[in-house]
């Protein structure tokens, strides 16, 4: 970074703060630790820290912890001295580029790697630590399979105890034990993943691990009491929003053409798509419940809304159940089926734009909570007219399908439940049943031209495919009762869709969509004409 002019010639802004000093301060007296150090973390939270550093509101960087994909540390953090290049893709085609020096250190959270494990403990012992944030995806908090039994790796972590853990939740519980036994300083654990009541989800999983270890005699009762005491260990709720697609090869090539070296994206062994740069949209929202018993950075100066739990909950419900995520989940699978690689291209399809508007403005807006700090209508307008059509983002429909089964309850089930509460059933809904049928049709992995394609990674999709294994593309009569076990599953949808009055309707749409080549388009057109 010493040759500032070369960077400026390439149109890249550099930090005005002393990067080495900031990293050193972060390592010596950490205030902020983050788990799950991929793209959204680097550009959004790393970006907030970068802004705070530029404003002089903080003086140290974030400690970055990876529990799942260690390639990220080896291929992206270490070789580039923990620097990250932010590339903001504006809707008008302009690009804002900046090097960020806000990431102080990257640690592999491996209990079988003595040096890394000791270092992580050292960080958690330090009373200077105020907050630990998380972007580990919703499945990172899950301890149990859909049937309620523990995953095998969680069972192992319970039986092996705090010193031999492998999963994110067990690692966090183990680090809280280290903090408890070394002064029990207060701390705030902040889930920033895109799921409802994320703080409650994190708290529940960490407490479960603590209680299971207590039963096995690994920990003391006072430790469990510490983890449960929100005046000492807080779990604030949050709402986060910034569309961050996979790194674009085109941007990598443009950066290399401007004089930078080794900018190409890598795909890790765990299928993480990552690069030395992060490309994302400009708009972003982070709403955090202000519950920090050990103090916190002045996050407001980085554009964060600090508020109470009720407001966070409303903002999160607005986004996740109405304005943004349901539209992604409604359109992503159909985009793949209709041959649209890019989501913004699908938004130019008149039929699909109508589906998006029906899901948001009509079906969702009727039951949306208003958080007060952000207008739902203005937020949805920004999504439909500015964010989603931003072709420069290059957001793919396949990315929108990743782990989509985990979000069906939040993104559709909550609204369906609100209709049942309001009207006795959800039969008024038209676009949401169409969306659910489209997701099921997508899981067959045959597009509307009859060509097979590879599904995005998703933990439940294999189970769904097994239940649909006797459904034959081109033969609507092959659908008998295969969908019943899925559509009645409250673990997936939060509600039995037959009891809500729309299970049969979804079956009917799905039956039409498997009729053969072109059936998906024909079916969408038929139902859109009824909106």
Residue ranges and their predicted role:
Residues 1-531:
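Substrate/ligand-engaging "lid" and interaction regions
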